[in-house]
Amino acid sequence: MLNLTINGKNIQVEEGTTILQAAKDNGIYIPTLCYDEAVKVYGACGLCVVEAEGIPKLLRSCSAKCSDGMVINTESDRVVQSRKIAMELLMSAHNGDCVAPCQLNCPARTDCQGYVGLIANGEYESALKLVKNKVSLPASIGRVCPHPCESACRRKNVEEPINIAQLKAFAADLDLNGEKYIPEKAEATGKKIAVIGGGPAGLTAAYQLAIKGHDVTIYDMMEKMGGMLRYGIPQYRLPKEVLDSEIEIIEKLSVKMINNVKLGKDFTIASLKEQNDAVIVAVGAWKSSSMRTPGEELDGVYGGIDFLRSVIQGNPVDIGEKVAVCGGGNTAMDACRTAVRLGAKEV
């Protein structure tokens, strides 16, 4: 066994033990970035350096072996200064690509921490511009998004997650109630693009493509644009006046919108391709999910999405006084609340 001293503590280790391992085994912390027990020692980060009496150079503790009688200091001024310089060098070449968990959890990869910070500083217009880099309908989406960003928010480890989705809607509402932000368009490319479907995906595609200078036309089978935002989400959750205002902004980017036309009946992908340089299919998912159980075809049994769409379009739906809802997701809860609003006494 070898006898040595680390930070005034006398310890014994087996021959061949590194200084880093000896320190770790005895509860002495030495920082390191590149060390991993599962791989060959690299020693590149320079953070694990220590000072040994009688040795002029600092030693990389991840690779330097212990020797008998060694006296080691892991916290001297010289060691601390060396580690500071090593970290500064590492960070000087860092591309700043560390992404916050809220952004990683967002399907659109919205810069959540960025716009939350701007809102906190009162920079509402800058916050909106940052949001609209990814989300073209922030006032609408901010109201109905299931906000997976908040489930990843690290603030919940202290108290509660930041209300990220509502902050997005807040910045967008300020814009809609004032002088609306219309992004600057790039020079016209001469390219024509057809978008099939005027829901959130189609509208977002049209918004982004128009900004890039393309000539965009949206084709939709319904009377108005909006897709499931309009026909699948009740008014109490998403006021259609808000959705209309956001769609108007997209129209002001010279996006043409054609309603009451259906793929396969009024046009085909091939016919659109003849007139355009590209075709984007964004038709959405309009069918209710089947439970694959007997009795689904009986009178008085409705799919959740079909039920909500009928109510939103003003079509009469006879639900009686007692309603059973199978499911517990967003559509199911919307169906529950809508049934109560239609007069159901028990849901």
Model-identified regions with their sequence ranges:
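Ferredoxin-type iron-sulfur electron-transfer modules and their immediate structural context
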Residues: 1-192, 240, 279-298, 344
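Conserved beta-strand segments of alpha/beta enzyme cores
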Residues: 71, 215, 254-256, 300, ...
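N-terminal Rossmann-like dinucleotide/flavin-binding domain of flavoprotein oxidoreductases
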Residues: 128-134, 167, 229-277
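Rossmann-like dinucleotide/flavin-binding elements
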Residues: 196-219, 258-268, 273, 287-289, ...
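Residues in the short beta-alpha loop(s) of Rossmann-like NAD(P)-binding domains
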Residues: 222
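Short alpha-helix immediately C-terminal to the canonical SAM-binding loop
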Residues: 226
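Redox-cofactor binding/interface segments in oxidoreductases and associated redox assembly factors
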Residues: 281-282, 303, 325
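A short, gly/pro- and small-residue-rich
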Residues: 293-309
